[in-house]
Amino acid sequence: MGRARKPPPALHRHCEGCFNRHCHVPVEPSVSCLVISCHLLCGATFHMCKESEHTLLCPLEQVPCLNSEYGCPLSMARHKLAKHLQVCPASVVCCSMEWIRWPNVDSETFLHENIMKETPSEECLDTALALQDQKVLFRSLKMVELFPETRDATEEEPDMNGDTSWEETGGAVGGVDARLAPNSCLPATSRQMMELSQEERDALAKTKEGMDLDKFGKWESMFSKEHAASVLTGSLGKSEDKNGDVAGKEQCSSNVRIGDAEGSAERRGPQESQKSQELPATMEMTGLAPWQDGVLERLKTAVDAKDYNMYLVHNGRMLIHFGQMPACTPKERDFVYGNLEAQEVKTVYTFKIPVSYCGKRARLGDAMLKCRPSEHKAVDTSDLGISVEDLPKSDLIKTTLQCALERELKGHVISESRSIDGLFMDLATQTYNFEPEQFSSETVLADLLGTAQPGGLHVELHSECVTRRHNKSSSAFTFTCNKFFRRDEFPLHFKNVHTDIQSSLDGWFQHRCPLAYLGCTFVQNHFRPPGQKAKVIYSQELKTFAIKPEVAPELSEKWKSDHLSGRDGKSLNSLTSLPLEVLQYIAGFLDSISLSQLSQVSVLMRNICATLLQERGMVLSQWKKKRYSHGGTSWKVHNQIWQFSSLFSKINSWEFNDVTSMSEHLKTCPFNIVERKTDPIRLTSMCQPQEKARESLVSTFRARPRGRHF
C-alpha cells in the first residue's frame, strides 16, 4: 500500500474569499498570507495558499495528453491540449466504409475465367480488390451453418464441468478454479477459501459490472433466509436419522453437510475414510445466489415464468459478472419497461386440429388427389443402382456460395420445411456429396481449399453500396474497410480511396472493354496523380490502394550498378552512405505508407523511421482478456503498438492519362467479330397478315349499291 497523502492545508480566513489582485491586507499567520504571481507568468495573481489550486487551472502548466492512458507520451501546456488532439498519435479512427459484393453464379463466367488465366497485375484494380474480398468471404463462411447435416458427430464440445483437470484450469493466482468444484463436495478449508468475504462482496457490488449496495443488502437478506431454511431442513433430517427412519444415507448441500452416526468419519474404516476424501464427479447443488452454479436451471423448475423474469431483471448484472449468463445480455438500464411487473406470455391456438377423419380435407390441396392411383417410390438415388462413392462430388465453392446467397436473398436455406396447412407439412431434403464428408464446427470454406486446388474468381468485379434495407449484421457478403488512421489522416483516406477510386472503378476511374461480357480482359486506367508520373495500384500485401511512381529505365539500371562495398565486404547503396541527419530529412517528405515500407528495408532505415513515429505514426492498444478464479473477466491493455498507417500522399485533383481511345482497341479486339448477314430476312411487318381496310361511315355508304329511282 502507498503512503497516505497529506490533505492540502486549509485556506486562511481572509484568503478563502479574497479575489482582489491588489489586496494589501497585512500578513497574519491565521488570517491572510502573501499575494504572489504565477511562476509560469500566465498573468494570474493570488494568495500563496491558493497556489496548489491554481496549478489545476493554469493554462501554462505542463500536463500529459488526454490520451496518455491510450499510449500518447507527450506533455504540453494546458491551453494546447485541444489543438493537439487533431494530431495526437493515440487519437485513432477506424474506417467503417462498407460495401456489398455478390457471388458470381452464372453471369460473366467467360470474363472471370480469362482473367484468372492471365498473370495477376496490381494495376487491375477491380480484380485485385475482388480477390481480396473473396479471401475474406471464404474465411467467414462456416460449413456447419450452411450444411448442418455434415457436422462431425464425434466432435466433443468444450465442457468446463466435465473431466477437465483442476490443475490445468487454474485461476488468476494458479490455484484451483472454483467453478469446477461443487461447493458441498469441498472440505471445510476449501469452502472458506472459495467463499467471498463481506468486503469482497461489497467491492463487487460497487463495481460497474455489479449492482448498487442497496439492492445487495436486499439480496443478502433473501439469501440468509434461504440459508436458514436449509439449516432447518437439515436439522429435521438429522432428527429423523436418530429415530431410525432413515439409516445409512447422507445429505449434501452447498452450505450444510449432514450425516448419521454410523456414517461418521470416526467410525469408518481406513478404506471408507479414504473414499470419502475423494471429490465426487456430480453432486446436487442448491441455493438461489447469483454466484452459485446452476442457479438458472433450478429457478426454471422451482418458480414460474413471472418470478423467473423478475429475477433476471434484478440480478442480471451479478449473473453476468459470475459467468451465469452471456455478456451480451442487456443491462438493467437498457430495459425500457424494467420497473413494470413481468407477465407470463401465453400462446393461444385458435386453430383446433380435428380428431376425426373429414373427407373434405383432400379438396383443400388437390380435388383429383383421391382419384389418382398411388404407389411407393424411393426419393433417394438407390433406384439408380449406383453406389454413393461413384456419384460425382459437388463443387465445394459453387455449392457453398449458392446456399449462402439463397439464405442472404430469400431469408432461408435452399432446403427448408414448409407447412401446407394445419395438418400437412412438406419435409424438404437436400443433401450434397462433398469430398470431405464431415466438418467440424470451426471449419470454414478457406480451410478446405488447398494449394493444389486451382483458384478462381467466384465473386462479381463490381461492388454495391450498403443500403438501409440490407441486414448487414448477419450478411456474409458485406465487407468493411477496417483500416486505422490518425484523426487528421482519415478525411484524406476516405476522399482519395473510397470516394475517388473505389466508387469509380466501374467505368469511370477504370474502363473495361465493352465486349468484356464475351471474355475480353482489356482494361484502361484513365486517371493519375497530378504533377508526377505515377500510377494507382492495389497491394495484396498491404490490402489497400497505393501510389507507385514510374521510374525511368535508365535510372533503374544505374541504381543496380551503383553499389558501394563496406568494410565488412557487404554491399551498400549510395542512400545508406548518407549521414543520419540527411536521411532523417529525406524521410520527412515521405507519406505514411512509404514510411511503413521503408522501415522494413534495414535496421538503419527502421531506426530512421522510428524518430518520426510520434509526429507521423499512431499508437494502438493491444487488449487481452484476463479471467479470474471467481469467474469474472476483464480486459487489460497488454501492449502498445506503434506503426504507420496506409495513407498515401494527398491528391486534390486527378489528371487524365495519355491512353488511346477505346475505339482503337475495338479495331483489334479478338472478340469484336463482325457478323455479316447475306441472306434476306423478312421484316416484322411482312411476317404478319395485311391489315384490313379501315372501316368508316363514309366507306360504308360508298360500298352500298345504288338503287333505281322512280
UniProtKB/Swiss-Prot annotation:
A molecular function GO annotation: zinc ion binding
InterPro entries: F-box-like_dom_sf, F-box_dom, Fbxo30/Fbxo40, Znf_RING/FYVE/PHD, Znf_TRAF, Znf_TRAF_N
Superkingdom of origin organism: Eukaryota
One GO-annotated biological process of the protein: muscle cell differentiation
Tissues in which the protein is found: Expressed only in heart and skeletal muscle.
Zinc finger (TRAF-type): 53-114
Keywords in alphabetical order: Cytoplasm, Metal-binding, Ubl conjugation pathway, Zinc, Zinc-finger
Membrane-spanning intervals of the chain: none
Assembly description: Directly interacts with SKP1 and CUL1.
The protein's name: F-box only protein 40
